[in-house]
Amino acid sequence: MSDVEIMAGIMRDRILNLLKEGKRIDGRSFEEYRDIEIKTGFIEKAEGSAWVRLGGTRVLVGIKVDVGEPFPDLPDRGVMTTNVELVPLASPTFEPGPPDERAIELARVIDRGIRESQAVELEKLVIVPGKLVRVVFIDVHVLDHDGNLFDATGLAAMAALMTTKIPKVEYNEETGEIIKLDEYEPLPVKHVPIPVTFAKIGSSIIVDPNLDEETVMDSRLTITTDETGHISAVQKGEGGSFKLEEVMYAIDTALKKADELRKILLEAVGSAS
């Protein structure tokens, strides 16, 4: 057995013993989030951007809006795409190169939560139906990884989208030219989906797992809900399982915690406007 495996076993035993006593390794309650800090307007060249600190986890999101063609099966909708970069300096487990499974999963969960809640009104991003639409790029950069990238990234993505300003445009039918005007308007955002992540360790379920807790968790569950209570994304990770009653508990708790996180987000976005 390697030194890493021995240390992981010791850490798991310590965390399990604390959980049996109703405690967590960092002193939080089972449903308590770490400190959250949200700042917007971090990237000058981007249409929108936000930096989020969740405990020791730090994420930067930039929004770029361009003009392109719609998807053939969605001619009356703008396009939105999410990309994640796990910066090697953020964690010794992150390596340079193409996105790995963790980056792909993170991008899909964030994209699905935003898309399925219809947070961004893509129908309002059409310039010429079937020909030209706005394309929204959500670029995520994980700067420090101390656990729960899903919730930190979800908050950063929404903060960036909600503070995005895009130039108004005019289309010249004769020349086919797109003219950008000096007048700007906010990106049309009508819902605020928030992901809430749970870790199951032994028989205990906790929210917002830190890196130590993620290292020893048996299973992970992320539930994204908007302000109406609509569930727009559910993602299970790791090899363990959740019982039906545990899933129902997670849904109820996700709705409650999402409301709390949404208030923090709206306050941060409001102070930036």
From Swiss-Prot:
Signal peptide: none annotated. Keywords: Cytoplasm, Exosome. The keyword Cytoplasm applies. HAMAP family: Exosome_Rrp42. Non-catalytic component of the exosome, which is a complex involved in RNA degradation. Contributes to the structuring of the Rrp41 active site. NCBIfam families: PRK04282.1-1. Belongs to the RNase PH family. Rrp42 subfamily. PANTHER family: EXOSOME COMPLEX COMPONENT RRP42, EXOSOME COMPLEX EXONUCLEASE RIBOSOMAL RNA PROCESSING PROTEIN. This is Exosome complex component Rrp42. The gene is rrp42.
